[in-house]
Amino acid sequence: MEESISGGRRKQYARPTINSYMYGNAMALSNIGLMKGDEEMAMKYALKADSIKTLVQEKLWNDKMKFFETLRKDTLAGVREAIGYIPWYFNLPDSKKYDDAWKQVMDEKGFSAPFGLTTAERRHPQFRSHGVGRCEWDGAIWPFATSQTLTAMANFINDYPQEILSDSVYFRQMELYVESQYRRGRPYIGEYLDEVNGNWLMGDRERSRYYNHSTFNDLIITGLVGLRPRMDNTIEVNPLIPEGKWNWFCLDNVLYHGHDITIIWDKNGNRYHQGKGLRVLVDGKLVGMTDKLQKLICENVL
């Protein structure tokens, strides 16, 4: 993030972003080692990941602010920014003490704005203080940052025993994310937009309209519909759609572990004529179902 409240691109600070990415890379390499039967490789990168996790939790967590922050030369920045949610993108945090950070996505003085999640907390005196068109991440809404936060949020809801966020919070933020991607009545995604009126900032610049750096499809597949990636032969589906919001949906032709996956939700059974409820099919064969829109685990079906 080029220009931010915690420090711009030229400041060599320790941030939740890069350190979380390194943790994710190390964990991925460790898992690759396990998959190929290379115990030495798996252990090497697992130890690297563990070391990074310890440093992130010890050095970047502000216990007073209840948030992961940027570490300047010797002190934390003292500002909550959306990058503080990226540790959950890789399931890095390992204690409930960090859960309170997620309360800020529902707080209008935190990150909650009429058109989505801001890149910095709205209560901060330097919010939106860097001007416009200067690559500033000081509050305006960036689809890239929103994508990261929503992925982290889905992980937090799915992978942690927590009572702070419900599927309705995720669903509403996804609605805002989708609704914001229009300009002059046509589908559009640019660099960033105003958090209050939804106008795209610098929308007439060529580079902005080619700035499709969100992860829209992944948010729909793994978050909203809820196909949760796993290493084993089990399919896990947990739609983050509140009861009563959608009566039907179909996610089809998803290549997963070399198989064609279909996920159907048909509340009354009269939309797709495959029966009532939530159904999972692998290569056209039914492998699991439930009457309600809820978590469904289909073991050893791949």
Question: What are these model-derived regions, one by one?
Answer:
Residues 15-31, 79-92, 139-155, 212-222:
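Well-ordered alpha-helical segments within folded domains of soluble proteins
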Residues 1-12:
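Aromatic- and acidic-residue-enriched carbohydrate-binding clefts of CAZyme catalytic domains
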Residues 74, 92-95, 154-157, 242, ...:
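Short, glycine-/Ser/Thr-/acidic-enriched flexible segments
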Residues 10-18, 62:
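Polysaccharide-binding and catalytic clefts of secreted carbohydrate-active enzymes
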Residues 65-84:
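Charge-rich, acidic-biased intrinsically disordered regions
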